[in-house]
Amino acid sequence: LIDPFGGRDDLAAHLVRAVGEPERRFEEDALRILRLYRFAARFGFAIDPATGAAARALGPHLDCVSAERIQEELLKLLAAPRPGSYLEPAVLAVVLPELEPEEQPERFAELCRTIDRIEPTAENVPARLAALLWPLGEAGARKALRKLKCSNALTDEVTALEREAGGGAGSFLLGHESGHSIARPIACGNRVPPQ
């Protein structure tokens, strides 16, 4: 096996690293920025510091990527075991600027913890997306989902969860410490979980 870029060593170290110059890789296709976080989340790997720095610096290049491609990577990221740890504020600020992840870091950190509390199954990706968009409320979530070109079915499911949870910026600021209690019923299929 010929391994000119040290991939086997990175696998052994549980590290995701761009091949060659990360800036160049991300300039070739900015969607690789989201893929970096998706693969790291999927396998629970760390991100090489230089690769992570390049991803954050070149995050604005995601504006040139189609909404459909961004949506696909975001949904795959949300299907990972603990995606909250890999939702990079500088990147998400480009993909979903209305969340203001860099302006409100405490709120964003609580959102990430809430997302991680929802069981990681394909069926729960809409619940995780609803948790991510919760500060926007139902109307804001619908607008964000349309911008990402999500299907009508996914948009309806996520906004129904938003409506049931009573999402919105004001309610989040008043009760952000209760995010885990909201995630528990969502993780149980919106049934009242056993006490």
PLM segments and residue spans:
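Short coil/turn segments at secondary-structure boundaries
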Residues: 5, 48-53, 67-71, 85-93, ...
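Short, well-structured alpha-helical segments
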Residues: 52, 56, 87, 155-163
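Double-stranded RNA-binding/processing signature
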Residues: 59-63
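A conserved active-site cap/scaffold subdomain adjacent to cofactor or substrate pockets
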Residues: 87-89, 96-97, 126-131
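C-terminal subdomains that position terminal phosphate/3'-OH groups for nucleotidyl transfer/ligation
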Residues: 101-195
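Short, amphipathic alpha-helical segments that act as regulatory/interfacial helices
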Residues: 34-41, 75-78, 91
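Active-site flanking loop/helix segments enriched in acidic
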Residues: 16-24, 71-76, 96-122
